[in-house]
Each structure stands twice: as structure tokens, then as C-alpha cells.
Amino acid sequence: MKEHYQGLGHIAIYTKDMDESIAFYEKIGGALRQRASSPTPDGDKLLALVSFGGFTLELIQSPTPMPLTEGNVPHFAVYVDDLDAAAAAVRAAGVDTFMTPEKKVLPGLFGGLENWFFTGPSGEQIELLHML
């Protein structure tokens, strides 16, 4: 069965404000691929797909507010080739929600990595990840 898998399809997260979230993810390098809506008994659910090269983020805005808690997806990670340059680009785009003042360097974890977390407009945690 594994020969049929072609990679990660997308990661879905809830958002409080679709337009704000799309603008945020475009500002940090994502590209809006598609917008759609899906009817529900409570009204239309808004959907958007934002591409980041190797993966897609699906944004979902429910017509009835969803509790935005850590839940089953505490964060998502984006591989970067240069952590310092990627963090500088995010900051240059106006994002000032980094969760720590400095990156973490963890040489013994998963063969060695460095990372930096920041938050998106609905409180979602985003990890910039560079494998050493």
C-alpha cells in the first residue's frame, strides 16, 4: 500500500478571520492557491489553500466559532535552508510574534536541529525548522 502514497497532502487549521490569515501567510511567503466555501446547516464554511513549496496549509473558518486550542495539532513546521535568514525574512514582513528571543539549537535531537517558533493570527504555532 505504501507505494501509493505521494507525500503530505495538507495540514488543516482553524482560523478566526480568513482574510487576515490569508494575508498573514502570504506575507511570510505562502501563495494562495484556491478559495472555496462549503455549505453547512449553520452557514458557509470558508476554506483556503495556501502553498509553501513542498506542502499546503488548509485554512478553515467555521460559521460557528470553533474553540482555538492546542488540540491534536500543537504546531506545524516549515523546513528552511537557513534559519537565521528565514527568521529575518519573517520579521521583515512585520511579524513580531516569535515565542522566544533566540532560536533553539538541539544537536542531539533527531540527528540535530535548530528551530524558532512564532504564532499566526489565530494563535497557531509555526516552527521554522533547519536540520543540522
Identify the residue ranges that each predicted region occupies.
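Conserved short beta-strand elements that form part of the metal-binding/catalytic scaffold
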Residues: 33-70, 118-120, 125-130
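N-terminal beta-strand motif that seeds the catalytic metal site of vicinal oxygen chelate
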Residues: 1-19, 73-76, 129-132
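Exposed loop/turn and edge beta-strand positions of beta-sandwich/beta-sheet ligand-binding modules
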Residues: 7, 44-46, 72, 112-113
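Core segments of cupin and vicinal oxygen chelate
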Residues: 3-6, 13-56, 85
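Short N-terminal helix-initiation segments at or just after the protein's N-terminus
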Residues: 15-25, 59-70, 91-95, 129
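Long, charged/polar, surface-exposed segments that mediate recognition or autoinhibition
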Residues: 77, 86-91
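Vicinal oxygen chelate
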Residues: 1-4, 35, 91-132
